[in-house]
């Protein structure tokens, strides 16, 4: 089964790569920072409503510059880590998806988190994710030992772990 949606812009993956493709255009960095901020705010609003996406990867999030609107595609019902709330899963999956790209500036991820922090539930969600990550520290130590093999997902898992634990929640 499939469904068709109205045109809703290009993906975050597309926009995130524009500044590197056009290094002479200084306005692109500001535009992409804005897009990630808007996405973070949108995800936070979704979480404030008690909803979750299920797998918000960069390829499943679009931005329409004409309307300044984010659209989330390819929703999923299941989680693969039952200890995490659906909102915690969303946040961790997006951070992992972003860091999986490896060549993107961390500033866009911080812009996303700045937008996300406007949500009522943001602080509790971040604290929840940090608690679960700390509880499973040995898993991430093991993933870190695999870094010399350059497995994309385990490297991104370690980066996501480090990023989330370093976030200020005060």
Where on the chain are the PLM-derived regions?
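Catalytic-loop of the protein kinase fold
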Residues: 47-58
């Amino acid at each position: 089964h499939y469904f068709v949606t109205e045109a809703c812009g290009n993906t975050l993956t597309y926009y995130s790569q524009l500044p590197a493709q056009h290094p002479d255009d200084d306005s692109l960095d500001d535009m992409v920072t804005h897009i990630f901020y808007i996405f973070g705010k949108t995800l936070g609003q979704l979480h404030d409503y008690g909803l979750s996406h299920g797998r918000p990867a960069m390829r499943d999030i679009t931005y329409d510059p004409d309307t300044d609107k984010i659209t989330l595609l390819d929703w999923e019902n299941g989680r693969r880590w039952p200890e995490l709330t659906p909102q915690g899963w969303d946040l961790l999956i997006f951070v992992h998806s972003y860091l999986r790209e490896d060549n993107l500036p961390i500033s866009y991820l911080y812009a996303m988190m700045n937008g996300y922090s406007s949500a009522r539930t943001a602080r509790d969600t971040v604290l929840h994710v940090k608690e679960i990550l700390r509880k499973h520290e040995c898993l991430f130590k093991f993933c870190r030992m695999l870094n010399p093999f350059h497995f994309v997902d385990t490297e991104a898992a370690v980066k996501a772990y480090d990023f989330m634990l370093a976030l200020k929640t005060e």
